[in-house]
């Protein structure tokens, strides 16, 4: 796990390495839901306790610590659209190893564009996030027949929250 700052008021600044990549596959079998979709590898939210930080770095090939890199799978929506044509209907978890609404999503809109593909085929969706950016997509989310959107709030103390989830939206947001 990443070390915590000694002073809870200390702001953590990290350099973020962003790499735009192309995905061969985006709709993958999951042991939790039927499928998972991860338009990003890496996560700016950088939760200190996240299970993904323990194994994703090994699979990503990055030398940077977890929370300091994000690979943006630029063709995620297009690849997903093709895969959905052949897929058996099932619940899709967006995203199993990152927050689908991490700050870069505001620029790239990959989660939003993937949601459009899933909506067109009416696949059930499950989203877990710590970001207020999910509100941007309410127009799409309300169109699904089957959808779950969960928000994780670890603590009501903003200072402690920033220690453990430095890139998450504030509790007030």
Region locations from a protein language model:
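Intrinsic disorder/low-complexity segments
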Residues: 4-8
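Conserved AdoMet/S-adenosylmethionine-binding subsite of the radical SAM
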Residues: 75-173
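The canonical Cys-X-X-Cys-His
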Residues: 47-50
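N-terminal [4Fe-4S]-dependent radical SAM core
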Residues: 9-43, 53-91
């Amino acid at each position: 796990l990443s070390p915590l700052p000694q002073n809870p008021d200390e702001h953590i600044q990290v350099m973020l390495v962003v790499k735009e990549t192309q995905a061969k596959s985006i709709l993958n079998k999951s042991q939790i839901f039927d499928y998972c979709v991860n338009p990003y590898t890496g996560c700016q939210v950088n939760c200190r306790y996240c299970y993904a930080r323990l194994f994703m770095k090994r699979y990503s090939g990055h030398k940077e610590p977890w929370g300091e890199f994000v690979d943006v799978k630029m063709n995620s929506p297009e690849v997903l659209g093709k895969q959905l044509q052949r897929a058996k209907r099932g619940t899709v978890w967006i995203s199993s190893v990152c927050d689908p609404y991490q700050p870069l999503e505001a620029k790239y809109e990959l989660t939003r564009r993937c949601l459009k593909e899933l909506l067109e085929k009416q696949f059930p969706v499950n989203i877990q996030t710590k970001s207020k950016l999910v509100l941007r997509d309410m127009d799409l989310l309300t169109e699904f027949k089957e959808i779950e959107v969960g928000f994780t709030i670890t603590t009501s103390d903003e200072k402690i929250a920033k220690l453990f989830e430095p890139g998450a939206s504030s509790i007030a947001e």
